[in-house]
Amino acid sequence: MDLDDALLDDVDALIAADTRQLLPMTASAGASIRAAGSLVTAEAIDRVVDDGRPHAVVVVGGGGSRAAGDILAAVAGSGSPVPVMTFGGPSLPGWVGPTDLVVAVSGSGRTPETLEVAAEAARRGCRLLVVSPDRTPLAHLADQTRGAVSVGVGIPTVSGTWRARTLMWSLATPLVLMAGGLGLVEHAQEAVDAAADELDRVADVCSPLRDSVVND
């Protein structure tokens, strides 16, 4: 696809070309992190921590939701005391069992594959953490599963719309904070705060209001 460089210096044309409003939603990533972090209660963290450190953390999600698990794996790093793995479904690996923590992540709370895996985890007696909007099928499944912990997430919107690909940071933040409680990530809250500040900085530097000559 050919790109007209002149478009980069025409703010009105650039904004008009962004019909999906991805630019403002991406620019609000820092705010999304802070909003998501404010929804992670100490009670929820304590409920996860009280069951002890799992043998493995298995994050299940599709698309941008799965990317949240990849972020957790990267933040935990190779030095994590337990392995952190991400799967897209449609089923759990055979070795996953009651000593493992399954984290079901869905920006819509309705992803069929994620719902199937979460239900399978419940049947196996796995520890279950659900990260999804409230009042969705996935959140309801957590409510009906003994011992499961559900963390609600707000969906960042611009003019009443939202895009799945912009939810990554909102979904990853609860995972990092929970991992901090389990001792898998050091200084988790500080890391989350620093990430939000850095994303704010990048959004400012890369703003369409800046001349393309100085826009990074």
Regions found by a protein language model. Give the residues of each.
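Short N-terminal helix-initiation segments at or just after the protein's N-terminus
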Residues: 1-5, 40-48, 113, 117, ...
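Extended interaction regions within the primary functional domain
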Residues: 7-9, 189-212
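A short, well-structured juxtamembrane/interface segment
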Residues: 34-51, 205-216
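Glycine-rich phosphate-binding loops that contact phosphosugars or nucleotide phosphates
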Residues: 52-200
